[in-house]
Amino acid sequence: MRKQLTIAALFVTVLMSPMIPVSADNPEIDYGNGSTVFSWSGTANTVELIGEWNWSEVTTLTENSGNWFAELNLDEGIYCYKFIVDGAYIFDPNNPYRGFCDDIENSVVRVKNSSRPNFASELSNDNLIITYLPGISGAMPDGTPIGLESATWDSTAMTWTLDTTTLADGKHTLKLEINDSDGNQAYDHLVPFWVGEQSEFTWEDSLIYMIMTDRFINGNTSNDGPPTGAAAGADWMGGDIEGVTQKIESGYFADLGVNVLWLTPFNTNAQGTGIAADGVHDVSAYHGYWPIEPREVDPRLGTADQLKEMVDAAHSAGIRVMMDYVVNHVHEDHTYYQENPEWFNQGCICGTENCDWTEHRLDCQFTSYMPDVNWKVREASEQFIEDALWWLEEFDLDGARIDAVKHVDDLAATNLATRINERFETVGTDYYLKGETAMGWSGDSLEDNQFQYDTINRYIGEDSLDGQADFVLYHAVVDNVFTQGARNYHHLDYWTSRSQDQYVPGAVMVPYVGSHDVPRIASRADVGTNDAYNQWQEQGLPGQPGTDGTYQTVLQAYGWLLTTPGAPLLYYGDEYGEYGGADPDNRHMYRDSSNWNYREAGLFENISALGQLRLDSIALKQGVYATRYASPDLLIYDMTHEQQTMSIILNRGQATTHDDFDSNDLVRFGDATISSSTISIPANSVTVIEQNAVTAPPP
C-alpha cells in the first residue's frame, strides 16, 4: 500500500463479542473542539450527510470554493454514513473504509476519543520526527515514550527528533505510548522502519520463497504431533518454525538470493482429519488453512517465542517475512464459529449442484466443515481485521498473503489494507499485501482474457492489495510453453508482455511456475510419464525424474521467471527440482543437499546463481521488459533500468548464434560467448548479459 490515508479512526470495543482492540491512526478530528470533520469536493447544488449516529437527521454541508464541510460532535465509535449529492446517495470518495448497516453498504467512519492524545510521525533525511498531538484539553506529555530516550524534544513544536544513523542496521519497530499531564492515555503509535542498506528495499526487489512449514525442516522433534490417521501424504510430517530459523541462520536463503519468506498460516489448526474434496480420503490440517484459534501459534509448529526468534533471525539476514492470512473461512471447531455462528454464511457447498463457484463465491462453503465468514457482519469483519493487525504487530511481520480473496466481499481487502496502512505505514515503510484470486487463461485472444485480468485487478489498488499471484500468466505459459511445449516462445513473449500492461499500474504482481496448489513442475516436465496429476498412493505417484531434459526445462522456466518483472515466487524444493503430483503429493518433505542427485545439485547451483544475480541487479529487479528478438525456440529480451540494462536469452532449441551484441557486453550467467557483435548460444540454455559492462582500456 502506497498512500497514507487520513480517515477518522476508531479504538473499537464490540460488546457482542469481546474484541482485543488494536487502535488505528490518523483520525480527522479537530482537536480544538473535538469534532469530526466530513468533507467532499466538487460542483453541486446541495451536499448533505446522513449517518448511523442518527439516520433520521440529515446534515447540510457548508460550501467554500467547491469544498464542502460539516463538523459533528460524535462519541467514540464506528458509524456508517453516506453523502447525498443533489439527491443521490454516494460513498465518501476520500474514505475507502466500508461496512454494512441493515444490509446496505456504506462508508464507515471510525471516531476516536478526542480527549486522548495522538502521535504523528515522519522519516526525513535519516531523522525520525515524532509529533505529539494533545487531546482536547491541550495537556502536554508526561515524560518521554520508550524508544525516544535519546531523541531531542522541542516543546514549541511538540516534537521528538531521533537521528536514526545512531541505530544499528536492520529493522526497528517503536511502539510509542504515553500519558498526558492530566492522566489521559494516548493512543499508541507504531513506527516500523529499516536502517541501513535495507531501507532502500522495494517490493519489486523481492524474490519470495514459499514455505509450507510442516513440510520444510523438522528443527524440534519434541513438538511433533501424533498421527491422525490421514491418508498417505496428507498427515503432519514434523516441519516447524525452528527448522525455518535454522535454515535462515545457515545462509541457505542468502545463497538463493531470497529476501522474502512467505510461510503458511501459523494459527492453531484443527485436530484429527477431514474428508478431502474427492469424498474418499482423510486429510489433516498440516497445511494451516483450517484455523480453530485466532491468536495462537499451532504447538505442532512451535511457540510464539520461537516465531519471534525466527522473524528476528530473518530480519538480521535482510529477509522480510510474510504471513498467510485466511479471511474466507474457519474450521467448524474455531472459537468464533462456536461462540458466534451468526458471523457466518449458511450457504451451499461450493461446486455442488445449484452451487456454482462463481455465482455463490461469497456465501458457499469450501467443505461442510469450513464455515464461510460473512464480511457483511460488522462484528465479524472488524474482528478478523483486528486479528490480522495483531499477528503483524505481535511478531513484527512485514506483509501478508491473503487467501481466497474473491470469495469474500470487496470490503475485506480494502478495509484490511486501510487498517494496515494506518497502523504500520506511519513513516512510509511499505507492508506488502499479496492476494490469491484464482483465475485462468481463456485462449490466445486478449479479449477472451479480459474477464480474468479484470477480476484480479478488482482487488488491487492504492486502497487495496498491492498485487496478486499472476494466475493468467501461469496458465498461459507454464504448461503450454515449458512443460508440454505446445506453444512457442512467441507465445511466451506475448503473455509476458501482457502482464506488464493489463494490471493496475504500480501493482507488484507475483509470477510463479510452482505452488502448493499445482503438481510440481519437475513432474509435469518429465516427458513420457502420465502420473503428474495423480494425488494418492493407490493411483501411482510420480517418481524422481531421470533425464537431463526435465531439469533443463525447469531451468528454462526459472530462468524466465527470475529475469522478468514482478516479485517472483520460488516454491520450496523447486530450487533442486523436487517432484510430486497433485495436492498433497506436491508437498513432500523438503530434502537437504545430502539427498540430492547430481542433476538436482546442478539445478540448485543454476537457480541460486540466477537468484543471486537478480538480487544484485537493479535492472532484473526494477527494469522494464522489452522484446529484442523472438522466434519459436529462441527469445531475447531486455530488462532496462536507467542505471543498467540486462539482456536475457532463452534457448530451448539447438545451438545458434545471434548478431546483436557488443564487445563491451558481458555474460553474467550461462556459457554463451561473445565475439565482436556475435553471441554463440548453447543448446537448451539460459543466458544473462549485462550491456556495456566492460570498460574499455585507456588509450
Model regions: which residues?
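Surface-exposed, short loops/turns at beta-strand junctions within beta-sandwich domains
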Residues: 74-78, 164-171
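Substrate-binding/active-site clefts of carbohydrate-active enzymes
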Residues: 202, 216-395, 412-426, 432-437, ...
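Aromatic-rich carbohydrate-binding modules that target alpha-glucans
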Residues: 28-78, 84-112, 143-156
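C-terminal beta-strand-rich structural cap/linker in extracellular carbohydrate-active enzymes
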Residues: 80-81, 676-698
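Bacterial N-terminal signal peptides
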Residues: 8-18
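Active-site-proximal helices and loops of the catalytic beta/alpha 8
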Residues: 27, 319, 387-389, 393-398, ...
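Short, solvent-exposed loop/turn segments at the edges of extracellular beta-sandwich modules
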Residues: 88, 179-184
